[in-house]
């Protein structure tokens, strides 16, 4: 990957705005929409809907409304048959979460064919996806989709489609960073992330928010 893409993700994460977090309510959990995700089997819609609710519930009940990431294998039926785990849960702090900090999630992302990573972000004033999120999606080939849920119950997602092109995606990522002062300041980080989201369709990544 090029130099911009190879920046340590923790550096990007540290530049995120330190807003006061929003405490999760039952109302936010109940308003999570059921989405017909592009390029994802219809049989998975309800599973992902349940997990999007779960990421809020876990954060509310077990992590003081801080960030949480759930990694879910789309090979779940096969893994269940084999008696293996198919969901990994990582608990983060107020500002970020590393999905790979959970050993099951790490194993799933390392070994299964396709995964979905569902992340709770609790700073609604930020872009729904951060550059760190985008970088994570591009870095791991078998992360098929990344879903961001906010503490207020809204959902956004990026999914790799049939025309997904990694080289073009990395070039777009670097272009987004270069066009925004190397993404050194908060506003630049947000603008770079927005630039990528706006143009993601050109590299075979579908973006939507609800």
Predicted regions span which residues?
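Conserved beta-strand-loop surface patch within small alpha/beta domains used
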Residues: 2-115, 127-210
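Acidic beta-strand-to-loop metal/phosphate-binding motif
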Residues: 116-123
